[in-house]
Amino acid sequence: MVKSLRFGDLDVPVPGFGAMGISFALGNDLSYEQAEPVLLEALKQGCTFWDTAVSYGPGKNEKLIGEFVKKHNCRDKLFIASKCGVAAFEDGSITNSAEHIQAYIEGTIERLGFTPDLYYIHRMDPNTPLEESIPAMDLLRKQGKTKYIGLSECSAETLRKANSIAKIDAVQAEYSAFETLHETDGLVDTARELDISFIAYAPLGHGWLVENFPYETPDDFAPDDYRRQIPKWQGDNFYANKRIADKFKELARKKNCTLPQIAIAWIAAQGMIAIPGTTKPERLIENFAAREIEIAEEENKEMRKLVDALKPQGDRYSESAMKNIGK
């Protein structure tokens, strides 16, 4: 079983917590009172590696976390990551300019009420050279406005070049038993080679790898649920992918655990920090208990065989969003 993983000079408890869903993307826009129970449960369980971003809201997600930390006086117990790189308060475009980075860290600090531990560039801007954006991120670190810096959904080539300009501490990208693209595009291998922590978002496949999957058709999603725009969740792809998820559930039954637990434990076994999100305290307890699951070598091989055989159908983002990843 994997209960912690190395991040820089720290040992962080795994899995972490992805806060996006409490105010963004899944048809949720929780008030502080609605969000507080799941954050309290995370704190109680010792799930303290949290992930947010300026664009989740925009600004609302950071503000919710900031209010929680202030109310419960728990800054010293949490590792908080946030992200810039999206003009969230302007036109929503991708921008990595030094001016943007400097301006957005100030807003993040104001909303959180403290400096984040880790600050990412959320999406890579092909119009801004790394020679401008990476020194700007490094300057934040030197100024004490963040301790660590990272990139999100970049290419292996970009990660390598960025790390040659200044030490990159983390790369965040989608990774799960349902989505292993980055094993074949070089990103996982490059991160390992350069000793860069890999933070796996969407470790439950954006909702596929859960018990009691609540959707029978693509029309069942809330009107503002972003999955309505993703090919993987629409048309015939929906039904094909649902059958794949059922196969993983059979594996969980053999292990006498839940599907989310074996999915998260498998990611930890790859040496990656998963950041599953939820709005429900009981689901957070379930997810965090994945750290108690022991995956033996033979079980790891069995799951790997299943992962390699059952490839999902459809792109993982809309056509427009696909243009902003892997750059």
Curated annotation (Swiss-Prot):
Disruption phenotype: Shows significantly reduced growth but does not affect tolerance to benzoxazolinone. InterPro entries: Aldo-Keto_reductase (IPR050791), NADP_OxRdtase_dom (IPR023210), NADP_OxRdtase_dom_sf (IPR036812). Substrate binds at residue 122. GO terms for cellular component: cytoplasm. NADP(+) binds at residues 51, 152-153, 202-212, 286-294. Gene3D superfamilies: NADP-dependent oxidoreductase domain. The active site is at 56 (proton donor). It holds the Pfam family Aldo_ket_red. PANTHER family: AFLATOXIN B1 ALDEHYDE REDUCTASE, REDUCTASE (YAKC), PUTATIVE (AFU_ORTHOLOGUE AFUA_8G01560)-RELATED. Aldo-keto reductase; part of the Fusarium detoxification of benzoxazolinone cluster involved in the degradation of benzoxazolinones produced by the host plant. Maize, wheat, and rye produce the 2 benzoxazinone phytoanticipins 2,4-dihy-droxy-7-methoxy-1,4-benzoxazin-3-one (DIMBOA) and 2,4-dihydroxy-1,4-benzoxazin-3-one (DIBOA) that, due to their inherent instability once released, spontaneously degrade to the more stable corresponding benzoxazolinones, 6-methoxy-2-benzoxazolinone (MBOA) and 2-benzoxazolinone (BOA), respectively. This is Aldo-keto reductase FPSE_08125. The lineage of its organism: Eukaryota, Fungi, Dikarya, Ascomycota, Pezizomycotina.
